[in-house]
Curated annotation (Swiss-Prot):
Protein's name in the database: LexA repressor
Catalytic activity field: Hydrolysis of Ala-|-Gly bond in repressor LexA
EC number from the UniProt entry: 3.4.21.88
Marked site (Cleavage) residue numbers: A86, G87
Lineage of the organism: Bacteria, Pseudomonadati, Pseudomonadota, Betaproteobacteria, Rhodocyclales
Assembly, per entry: Homodimer.
Naturally occurring in which organism (per UniProt): Azoarcus sp. (strain BH72)
InterPro entries linked to this entry: LexA, LexA-like, LexA/Signal_pep-like_sf, LexA_DNA-bd_dom, LexA_repressor, Peptidase_S24_LexA, Peptidase_S24_S26A/B/C, WH-like_DNA-bd_sf
Function: Represses a number of genes involved in the response to DNA damage (SOS response), including recA and lexA. In the presence of single-stranded DNA, RecA interacts with LexA causing an autocatalytic cleavage which disrupts the DNA-binding part of LexA, leading to derepression of the SOS regulon and eventually DNA repair.
Keywords on record: Autocatalytic cleavage, DNA damage, DNA repair, DNA replication, DNA-binding, Hydrolase, Repressor, SOS response, Transcription, Transcription regulation
Residues annotated to bind DNA: 32-52
Record family assignment: Belongs to the peptidase S24 family.
GO terms classed as biological process: DNA repair; DNA replication; negative regulation of DNA-templated transcription; proteolysis; SOS response
Length: 202
């Protein structure tokens, strides 16, 4: 299973963690110079490249012309993703309906976004049409975990069962059939794992 574009590289994750730690310990974001110093970058351009990549992936917001113009996107609330257009990253701006004030650390592992569930295929797992699931971005998951998966540009929420190259995405409703994917010949990309459920008024 391949990570999609919005997955962070290990260095980007380290920089994001550094920004979080600085905000939590000092009550302010780091400057670009502090990012350079912390990671041993010889040029501010190297830090800027990583910061812009983080901004493009929706992890931070950059404010031009400010020394401390780095803002954690999560500080504005978790992005609520509605319908996902074919071929686009799940956190593309056009998919974000709103930002909802939830502390991502309430979930373990921490949530990266909320996804609005469409349909009743997971009804017997207590996941109903219109519910919001908290999702931790990951391209790895264990058997039995509820995952957000992309198959041929369609995004689905199902329980994962993997047997070698054969992956089954199992519904929790007898009215729906499992989705079986042979990863040797078909594309299956894991977008994340469900880490929480928020019931909405239906």
């Amino acid at each position: 299973m391949n990570a999609r574009n919005e997955q962070l590289t290990s260095r980007q994750q380290e920089i994001l963690d550094f920004i979080r730690q600085t905000v939590e310990s000092e009550g302010r974001p780091p400057t670009r110079a502090e990012v350079c110093s912390a990671f041993g970058f010889k040029s501010p351009n190297a830090a800027e490249t990583h910061l812009r990549a983080l901004a493009a992936k929706g992890a931070i917001l950059l404010e031009e012309g400010r020394a401390r113009g780095i803002r954690l996107a999560e500080a504005l609330g978790l992005p609520l993703v509605g319908r996902v257009a074919a071929g686009n990253p799940i956190l593309a701006a056009e998919h974000v309906e709103a930002r909802i004030q939830f502390d991502p650390a309430l979930f373990s592992p921490r949530a990266d976004y909320l996804l609005r569930v469409r349909g009743m295929s997971m009804r017997d797992a207590g996941i109903l049409d219109g519910d919001l699931i908290a999702v931790h971005r990951s391209h790895e998951a264990r058997n039995g975990q509820v995952v957000v998966a992309r198959i041929d540009d369609d995004v689905t929420v199902k329980t994962l069962r993997r047997n070698g190259p054969i992956v089954e995405l199992l519904p929790a409703n007898p009215d729906f059939d499992p989705i079986v994917v042979d990863t040797r010949s078909a594309a299956l990309e894991l977008e994340g794992i469900m880490v929480g459920l928020i019931r909405t008024d239906h």
